[in-house]
Swiss-Prot record:
One Pfam entry name: WH2
GO cellular component: actin cortical patch; cellular bud neck; incipient cellular bud site; mating projection tip
Residue span of region Disordered: 1-752, 786-806
Biased composition (Polar residues): 254-265, 713-737
Protein name (record): Verprolin
Species assigned in the record: Saccharomyces cerevisiae (strain ATCC 204508 / S288c) (Baker's yeast)
The keyword rRNA processing appears for this protein: no
Higher taxonomy: Eukaryota, Fungi, Dikarya, Ascomycota, Saccharomycotina
Compartment annotation: Cytoplasm, Cytoskeleton
Entry keyword set: Cytoplasm, Cytoskeleton, Glycoprotein, Phosphoprotein, Repeat
MF (Gene Ontology): actin binding
Residue spans of biased composition, Pro residues class: 1-15, 119-180, 236-245, 306-335, 372-382, 396-407, 423-432, 557-579, 649-661
Function: Involved in cytoskeletal organization and cellular growth. May exert its effects on the cytoskeleton directly, or indirectly via proline-binding proteins (e.g. profilin) or proteins possessing SH3 domains.
Length: 817
């Protein structure tokens, strides 16, 4: 529209008018400009929206990406393309406004290649930093595809380490030669890098390593510039190799670089592109291959020792392999550094890579990046120490370590040990990047820290566990053990203070039911075991009239106390739990895992001492109560069980001296400690005694029911315990079948006792059937009560839908006749 009006303006003015046409031209031109700007603005807005996401995340890295695209386009596409990025990239990158649409135009001119670079970069995330090194590769080989492919290839590269080691080294080889080749042109490389960081991160580094990328991008130009004069042709490669061998390998690596530098440089562009294509094709394998990366990395490592000679023989291929190995190996060098074995640097690095499969994958993904990173960070780090180079090499690892930390640790425990020293050192150079290698250890430490906290709760292992847990290759087994221990702890509730006896017993009982370990602690707390061993008897006691039968089933030692102590036990029983509570807390803090009976015995001894102090006052009343109720209980106890051990407990109450019962209490727990098997029975009765005694103490009226229970016990003893359960729960056992066949329903008669709850004073809601149930229907007056007919009996017919088999409420129909 704008072009057309320019020629026609002269003719239209006469029609419009003499004066009007000129303003119309200016107006039209202005309108056209406005329209064009608006239309462009629409496109620009779209472009901005798409590109803003990346630059906002990437900052300085964005400039590097833009530079890379610009440089690539300059060499690969016509020179016309580079000026556009060159002019637009820095300005627009700085502005982050108008330049972004221009970048899109560049991508359109560059055809699909820049677009893949844009699309690929989001996947690599960390690749942007890698992309910066590929830029030197791009100058070496004029091909726009190279930068775009490395960005895309960066993700596949990790796949390749797992899938095939050679391609990875080859990919780094391309970066390696460019670095030496760029040695002479080193200043140019840094120049390209600043531009590259401006653009590429925008597309590639979204969120993973924006800070990391920015750091390498910023540091890369100065470091290579400074280091390049020092090392001249080989400086960039020299720094990366030093990390792998620490010191001894520096000369070795430099030599292969010398041999490799000239030939591979020529081959790199051609060789690098096919490898990139292969890597792109292999991207799909990434997910499946990563799991096996450790084994394949080992194969690469095995190949690595042979590779150094190869560079001398075949500079292009060995160089490709050799450089990648140092960049990939640099993470392992941490091991050689720790192990102080330069000879093993080639082979030793091999084992470390498995722990850093993610690191390897990241390095491979950023294989180009790996080489640039060492030049950027490696030169300063070697100046500082040999270990920092390892950090530099590990720098590519940072993104992967967080996901692989478990795998990394499992793969090599030694690396974790080495990584521990690395952890403190790397953090200083780059905050996020430094954490990369240490990050792998730190995440486990975080896990371990959380776990040590659990372990500290469990035992004194916390201090040692923080270091040892981090280093071992298998933190997972420790986690499982810790979790198991945690369960025991939480069940025991060592951290929490016990407020009431009932709750304590419940918590302890649950813990014992769940885990065996608490049992040693529980001996100190005698009551808890009853729930586990005699949980059914305990329920039966609550629901039935036979409190003493359960005591006899549990063991007789406490039963005398139960009979004697029915009123007093609540006071006496509580003290043991109180004493036991401090012991469990101490035990939980000191040693929850220790099953030694001696410690428990000591704790028990302590516990009895406290009960000893408390019980003496209650003991005399207990003896007085015992005089009343001892006879039936004793008879039952002696009849039911051999009272070799039981006789001893009764003897202390006979002594009647308060101190004696106090001593007898400790003696009983000690015996239970000495004999783990017999100990539970006494403990269980103590619980039953406590519960019964507490209920009795709360309701003195309920104390009489236990004595009648023996008679019921005698009647019930004839039946098997299972039958007793049913009868105690649902009936008194007196119900019998009067008719085998019901004449009314023509069906076999049913024992109502199986479906009716037997009433007792101890059961709420169901009372013993000695009273007639009266329904208060005073509000309802039936005038024809006398005239209401009785229902006729149902006879000589079969009920299709028979009604209930009985009543859930105990009914004694004799009371209503």
């Amino acid at each position: 529209m704008a072009g057309a009006p320019a020629p026609p303006p002269p003719p239209p003015p006469p029609a419009l008018g003499g004066s009007a046409p000129k303003p119309a031209k200016s107006v039209m031109q202005g309108r056209d400009a406005l329209l064009g700007d608006i239309r462009k603005g629409m496109k620009l807005k779209k472009a901005e929206t798409n590109d803003r996401s990346a630059p906002i995340v990437g900052g300085g890295v964005v400039s590097s990406a833009s530079g890379s695209s610009g440089t690539v386009s300059s060499k690969g596409p016509s020179m016309s393309a580079p000026p556009i990025p060159g002019m637009g990239a820095p300005q627009l990158g700085d502005i982050l406004a108008g330049g972004i649409p221009k970048l899109k135009h560049i991508n359109n001119n560059a055809s699909t290649k820049p677009s893949p670079s844009a699309s690929a970069p989001p996947i690599p995330g960390a690749v942007p930093s890698v992309a910066a090194p590929p830029i030197p590769n791009a100058p070496l080989s004029p091909a726009p595809a190279v930068p775009s492919i490395p960005s895309s290839s960066a993700p596949p590269i990790p796949d390749i380490p797992s899938s095939a080691a050679p391609p990875i080294p080859i990919v780094p080889s391309s970066p390696a030669p460019p670095l030496p080749l760029s040695g002479a042109s080193a200043p140019k490389v840094p120049q390209n890098r600043p531009h590259m960081p401006s653009v590429r991160p925008a597309h590639r580094s979204h969120q993973r390593k924006s800070s990391n990328i920015s750091l390498p991008s910023v540091s890369a130009p100065p470091l290579p510039s400074a280091s390049l004069p020092t090392h001249v042709s080989n400086p960039p490669q020299a720094p990366p190799p030093p990390p792998t061998p620490t010191i001894g390998l520096d000369s070795k690596n430099i030599k292969p670089t010398d041999n490799a530098v000239s030939p591979p440089s020529s081959e790199v562009p051609a060789g690098g592109l096919p490898f990139l294509a292969e890597i792109n094709a292999r991207r799909s394998e990434r997910g499946a291959v990563e799991g096996v990366s450790s084994t394949k990395i080992q194969t690469e490592n095995h190949k690595s020792p042979s590779q150094p000679p190869l560079p001398s023989s075949a500079p292009p291929i060995p160089t490709s392999h050799a450089p990648p190995l140092p960049p990939t190996a640099p993470p392992p060098p941490s091991l050689p550094n720790v192990t102080s074995a330069p000879k093993k640097a080639t082979s030793a690095p091999a084992p470390p890579p498995p722990p850093l499969p993610a690191a390897m994958s990241s390095a491979s993904t950023n294989s180009v990046k790996a080489t640039p990173v060492p030049p950027t960070l490696a030169p300063p780090l070697p100046n500082t120490t040999s270990v920092p180079p390892n950090k530099a090499s590990s720098m590519p690892a940072p993104p992967p370590p967080p996901p692989p930390p478990p795998g990394a640790f499992s793969t090599s425990s030694a690396l974790s040990a080495s990584s521990i020293p690395l952890a403190p050192l790397p953090p200083p150079p780059p905050p996020s990047v430094a954490t990369s290698v240490p990050s792998a250890p730190p995440p486990p430490p975080t896990l371990t820290t959380n776990k040590p906290s659990a372990s500290s709760k469990q035992s004194k292992i916390s201090s040692s566990s923080s270091s040892s847990a981090v280093t071992p290759g298998g933190p997972l087994p420790f986690l499982a053990e810790i979790q198991k221990k945690r369960d025991d702890r939480f069940v025991v509730g060592g951290d929490t203070g016990y407020t009431t006896q009932d709750k304590q017993e419940d918590v302890i009982g649950s813990s014992k039911d769940d885990n065996v370990r608490p049992s040693p602690i529980s001996p100190s707390i005698n009551p808890p075991k009853q729930s586990s061993q005699n949980g059914m008897s305990f329920l039966d006691e609550i629901e039935s009239k036979l409190h003493k039968q359960t005591s006899s089933n549990a063991f007789n030692a406490p039963p005398p106390h139960t009979d004697a102590m029915a009123p007093p036990l609540p006071p006496s029983a509580p003290p043991p739990p109180i004493t036991s509570l401090p012991t469990p807390t101490a035990s939980g803090d000191d040693h929850t895992n220790d099953k030694s009976e001696t410690v428990l015995g000591m704790k028990k001894a302590k516990a009895p001492a406290l009960p000893g102090h408390v019980p003496p006052p209650p003991v005399p009343p207990v003896l007085s109560d015992d005089s009343k109720n001892n006879v039936p209980a004793a008879s039952l106890l002696h009849d039911v069980l051999p009272s070799s051990n039981l006789e001893k407990p009764p003897s202390p109450p006979v002594a009647a001296a308060p101190p004696l019962p106090t001593f007898s209490a400790p003696s009983l727990p000690q015996q239970s400690v000495s004999t783990s098997i017999p100990s539970p029975p006494p403990v269980a009765p103590t619980l039953s005694v406590r519960t019964e005694t507490e209920s009795i103490s709360k309701n003195p009226t309920k104390s009489p029911p236990p004595p009648p229970s023996p008679s019921t016990m005698d009647t019930g003893t004839s039946n098997s315990p299972s039958k007793n359960l049913k009868q105690r729960l649902f009936s008194t056992g007196g119900s019998t079948l009067q008719h085998k066949h019901n004449t009314h329903t023509n069906q076999p008669d049913v024992d109502v006792g199986r479906y009716t709850i037997g009433g007792s004073n101890s059961i709420v809601g169901a009372k013993s059937g000695n009273e007639r149930i009266v329904i208060d229907d005073s509000r309802f007056k039936w005038t024809n009560v006398s005239q209401m007919p009785k229902p006729r009996p149902f006879q000589n017919k079969t009920k299709l839908y028979p009604s209930g088999k009985g009543s859930s409420v105990p009914l004694d129909l004799t009371l209503f006749t």
